[in-house]
């Protein structure tokens, strides 16, 4: 009986964490994959992947990171 109650509580906690991210925010996270552009100070890939919005270029900050500036 305790195992069933524990499983139900864990399931409820996981569900509440999943619902914590609004649908609109989730869609914004994947805007680059849909062909949208990246705004200022967002990470980009100069050789491939999502492109920066007009007027911005993908600048390499260091070996591991590039941002739209």
From Swiss-Prot:
Disulfide bonds join 37-53, 44-58, 52-68. The keyword 4Fe-4S does not apply. Residues 21-34 form a propeptide. Residues 1-20 form the signal peptide. It comes from the Eukaryota. It is found in: Secreted. The keyword Hydrolase does not apply. Keywords: Disulfide bond, Knottin, Neurotoxin, Secreted, Signal, Toxin. Pfam families: Toxin_7 (PF05980). One of its GO terms (molecular function) is toxin activity. Expressed by the venom gland. One of its GO terms (cellular component) is extracellular region. Belongs to the neurotoxin 01 (U2-agtx) family. The presence of a 'disulfide through disulfide knot' structurally defines this protein as a knottin. Insect active toxin causing rapid but reversible paralysis in crickets. No activity shown in mammals. Does not show effect on mammalian voltage-gated calcium channels. This is U2-agatoxin-Ao1w. It comes from Agelena orientalis (Funnel-web spider).
